[in-house]
Structure formats: structure tokens, C-alpha cells
């Protein structure tokens, strides 16, 4: 044990001597073997009154912050021009006013909207109510025809069951002598 302690002291002082750093005396003798470990330049201070600060491992917030920055950028990139466009439309065009419909004139479906942007969207992107009505009527007609065909099919199946006829009469049955029953008679062979 004493040899290990002596070896440790010698190695520390040798490293300190080679590096050029001064060592403080440990026992007061100032000899080569009695020197201690290198002293720190300043006492160790921990910031705050709660002792040593710890390094907590947390998940990275890089992607969250990047996403939020890009979200703000693209909202500003699209939101500002849209706000300017809506303001210009409201100032220079304005909302539609209710007026008397001339005799014999049938208004288009987008003319019932008050705001010009709503009118433009209804004219270019929405279907007219007549088209929606016709499409719904076509779907209802197809569903009614399908239901009627299902009822007819049920009636046909019921009559086939009652009368004893069916699709098996349309196919010729094979001769019984052609069927080989030997695998069933001796399954272990």
C-alpha cells in the first residue's frame, strides 16, 4: 500500500514538473517525494445556492423550433398578400346590393352571394344547385332500381325453391360409374 501511495505521488509530481506547473507543498517539507497534487488556480464555485449544477439530457428542440419558424414564415408569406387582396376588394369593389330583378331574367346561382370573393368562389368552384339536385336524383333513381332488382331476385329465388327448379338442371351430371370411390374405401393405402 505504501509503495502504491509513493508511486502515485512520484507520478503526479513528475507530470507536474514536466508540464511546468508549480506544485504546492503538502507536508511543508518541500521535497520531491513530499509534494502533493497540483493546486487549483481558484476555489471551485458552483453557481447558485443549490450545489453543483447537473446536465440534464433533454430531447432536441431543433425540429420543433424549425417547424414553428417555417410555419410563421409561410403564414406571413401567404397571409399578408391575402389580407391586402381582401382589403383592396372590399375598398374598390365592395359588397353587392339587393336590387329588383328584371322581368324574364333568371339569376345565376352565384349572384345570390353578397361578397365578390364568395361570388367568384361559387361561380368557379361550386356546382350549381340544379346540378347538385340532378346528381342526387340520379343517385336516388339508381338506388331505387337496385332495390327493385333485389326484390325481384328474392322473389325468383323463392319461386325456384318452391317449384324445385334451379340452375343445376342446366348442367348434365356425370355418370356415377365414372366416380372412383376406392380412396374413400381404403384411405390408408
Curated annotation (Swiss-Prot):
Transit peptide residue numbers: 1-46
Pfam families reported for this sequence: NDUF_B5
Alphabetic keyword roster: Electron transport, Membrane, Mitochondrion, Mitochondrion inner membrane, Respiratory chain, Transit peptide, Transmembrane, Transmembrane helix, Transport
GO cellular component labels: mitochondrial inner membrane; respiratory chain complex I
Domain of life from the UniProt record: Eukaryota
Ribonucleoprotein listed as a keyword: no
Membrane-spanning residues: 73-93
SS bond partners: none
Claim: Oxidoreductase is one of the keywords in the record: no
Subcellular compartments: Mitochondrion inner membrane
Membrane-topology descriptor: Single-pass membrane protein
Family: Belongs to the complex I NDUFB5 subunit family.
PANTHER family: NADH DEHYDROGENASE [UBIQUINONE] 1 BETA SUBCOMPLEX SUBUNIT 5, MITOCHONDRIAL, NADH-UBIQUINONE OXIDOREDUCTASE SGDH SUBUNIT
Described purpose of this protein according to its UniProt entry: Accessory subunit of the mitochondrial membrane respiratory chain NADH dehydrogenase (Complex I), that is believed not to be involved in catalysis. Complex I functions in the transfer of electrons from NADH to the respiratory chain. The immediate electron acceptor for the enzyme is believed to be ubiquinone.
Subunit record text: Complex I is composed of 45 different subunits.
Name of the molecule in the record: NADH dehydrogenase [ubiquinone] 1 beta subcomplex subunit 5, mitochondrial
Species this chain originates from: Pongo pygmaeus (Bornean orangutan)
Classification lineage: Eukaryota, Metazoa, Chordata, Craniata, Vertebrata
Amino acid at each position: 500500500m505504501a509503495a502504491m501511495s509513493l508511486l502515485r505521488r512520484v507520478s503526479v509530481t513528475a507530470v507536474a514538473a514536466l508540464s511546468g506547473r508549480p506544485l504546492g507543498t503538502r507536508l511543508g517539507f518541500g521535497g520531491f517525494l513530499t509534494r502533493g497534487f497540483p493546486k487549483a488556480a481558484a476555489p471551485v464555485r458552483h453557481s447558485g445556492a443549490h450545489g453543483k449544477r447537473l446536465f440534464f439530457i433533454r430531447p432536441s428542440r431543433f425540429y420543433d423550433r424549425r417547424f414553428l419558424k417555417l410555419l410563421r414564415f409561410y403564414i406571413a408569406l401567404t397571409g399578408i398578400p391575402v389580407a391586402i387582396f381582401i382589403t383592396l376588394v372590399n375598398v374598390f369593389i365592395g359588397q353587392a346590393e339587393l336590387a329588383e330583378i328584371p322581368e324574364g331574367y333568371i339569376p345565376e346561382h352565384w349572384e345570390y352571394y353578397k361578397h365578390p370573393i364568395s361570388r367568384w368562389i361559387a361561380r368557379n368552384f361550386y356546382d350549381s344547385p340544379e346540378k347538385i339536385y340532378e346528381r342526387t336524383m340520379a343517385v336516388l333513381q339508381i338506388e331505387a332500381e337496385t332495390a327493385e332488382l333485389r326484390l325481384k331476385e328474392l322473389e325468383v329465388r323463392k319461386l325456384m325453391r318452391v317449384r324445385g327448379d334451379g340452375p343445376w338442371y342446366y348442367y348434365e351430371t356425370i355418370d356415377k360409374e365414372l366416380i372412383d370411390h376406392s380412396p374413400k374405401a381404403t384411405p390408408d393405402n
